[in-house]
A protein has these predicted regions:
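Low-acidity, Ser/Thr- and Arg-rich intrinsically disordered low-complexity segments
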Residues: 2-20, 24, 28-40, 44-55, ...
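Structural preference for solvent-exposed beta-strand-turn elements
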Residues: 66, 76-337
Length: 337
C-alpha cells in the first residue's frame, strides 16, 4: 500500500504553495502498490510557502510558453511534486529561473510526479475549500479529487525533471524581506523591457563595505537605491535578471522580521527565505560604469516634499490622455515648482 501523509493545510494553503514553485501539499493513502496519493487536510498551516507555488508556473508560460517533452522539460511548464524524503517538495525550473518550496509532512510511502503547471494551478484555484486528494498510477496519470469534483490529467515521471543546480554558499548577504521587496520596487521600473541590450534588462547588485547598491537603467532613466546591511555581507558585483527580481518581489512579505539570505556564485544567485529557494542565472558581462553617468556639476538642485511632488504629478496626469506620451513640464521659479 502506498501512502504519503503530509502536514495539514487547507485549500488556501495549497493555493499559496502552488504559487511558490509548483504543486500541492499534504498527502494520504493509495489503493494499489503502484499509486501515490496526496491528500490535503482542512487545517491551515503557514500558507506562505504554498503561495509561491501557484505563482511560479504562470510566469514560465508567459516567458517560455512551450510544453516540452520529458527530456526537454525546461521545466517550469511542469510542477514536480516530490515526496521521497520526510517532506513534500514542489519544484519548477526552466533552466534560467527555478524555485523550490518545501512542505513538512509524514511520508508513509515515497513518490514523485511531474504535472503540467498551468493546468494544475487552474484546477486548484477552482476547487471548493475542502480536502483535496491527488492520486497517481504507474503510468503517471493523476486524479485530483475534491468533494464532487474530479479531474484526470496526464503527468510525467518525476525522475526526468530538471532539478535546481547546487549552489556553493560562499559569498552572501542577509536583509529583511521587507527591505528586499522595497529595494526592488523602487528600482525595477527603470530597467529595459526588451532585450536589445540584455544588460539593461537586469539590475546591478553591488555590495561594498557593508552597503548594498541596486541600480536599474534603460538608457533614458536610472534608479539607484543604497541600503546599509547588518551582519555578514561579502563584497560582490553581479547583474540579476529583472524578471527574476519582479517575480521574487511578488512572493516576499512585508515583514521586517523575516529575512532573506542571498548567495552569489559566478553564474547563479540563490535566494533563501521561509521554506523557499529561488535560483536564477546571472546576466554575464560588465555592468555600466554608473559613476561616469552621474555628476555633481548641476545648474539647479531642488529639495521638495516627496508626497507633495507625487500628488502634483498625479494631478498633472489627469490632463494626459491614455496612450499619450507627452512629457510633464516642470518649471522652477521664485522658490516654486
Amino acid at each position: 500500500m502506498n501512502w504519503i501523509h503530509g502536514s495539514m493545510m487547507n485549500l488556501t494553503g495549497l493555493y499559496h504553495a502552488i504559487r511558490n514553485a509548483t504543486g500541492t501539499a499534504v498527502t494520504k493513502p493509495i489503493r494499489k502498490p503502484s499509486n501515490t496519493e496526496i491528500k490535503l487536510l482542512p487545517i491551515s498551516l503557514n500558507s506562505k510557502p504554498l503561495e509561491t507555488i501557484v505563482w511560479m508556473e504562470p510566469i514560465t508560460l508567459i516567458a517560455f510558453g512551450k510544453h516540452l517533452d520529458v527530456l526537454g522539460m525546461i521545466d517550469k511548464t511542469v510542477h514536480n511534486i516530490n515526496a521521497t524524503t520526510n517532506e513534500i517538495k514542489f519544484t519548477g525550473n526552466d533552466m534560467e529561473l527555478g524555485i523550490e518550496t518545501i512542505v513538512e509532512g509524514e511520508i508513509i510511502e515515497k513518490g514523485k510526479i511531474a504535472i503540467d503547471a498551468k493546468l494544475f494551478s487552474e484546477i486548484v484555484r477552482k476547487l471548493p475549500d475542502n480536502d483535496i486528494t491527488l492520486t497517481t498510477d504507474s503510468n503517471n496519470n493523476a486524479l485530483i479529487t475534491c468533494e464532487k469534483s474530479k479531474f484526470n490529467i496526464a503527468g510525467k515521471s518525476g525522475d526526468d525533471f530538471s532539478y535546481l543546480p547546487a549552489i556553493i554558499k560562499d559569498k552572501m548577504i542577509t536583509l529583511s524581506q521587507f527591505q528586499l521587496k522595497e529595494v526592488i520596487n523602487q528600482t525595477i521600473f527603470s530597467i529595459a523591457i526588451n532585450d536589445n541590450n540584455k544588460m539593461m534588462t537586469g539590475e546591478l547588485f553591488e555590495v561594498n563595505e557593508g552597503t548594498l547598491k541596486v541600480v536599474g537603467l534603460d538608457g533614458h532613466r536610472i534608479a539607484i537605491r543604497n541600503i546599509k546591511l547588518e551582519g555578514r555581507s561579502d563584497d560582490v558585483r553581479v547583474v540579476i535578471p529583472g524578471k527574476t527580481l519582479q517575480e521574487i518581489s511578488k512572493i516576499l512579505n512585508a515583514d521586517a522580521e523575516s529575512f532573506v539570505n542571498i548567495y552569489f556564485t559566478n553564474n547563479h544567485v540563490l535566494f533563501e527565505f521561509d521554506q523557499t529557494h529561488v535560483v536564477s542565472r546571472l546576466i554575464e558581462g560588465d555592468y555600466f560604469k554608473i559613476s561616469q553617468m552621474l555628476s555633481n556639476d548641476y545648474e539647479t538642485k531642488v529639495s521638495i516634499n516627496k508626497k507633495e511632488f507625487l500628488d502634483s504629478i498625479d494631478r498633472a496626469n489627469l490632463l494626459i490622455r491614455e496612450g499619450d506620451k507627452k512629457p510633464i513640464i516642470i518649471n522652477i521659479l521664485n522658490g516654486l515648482l
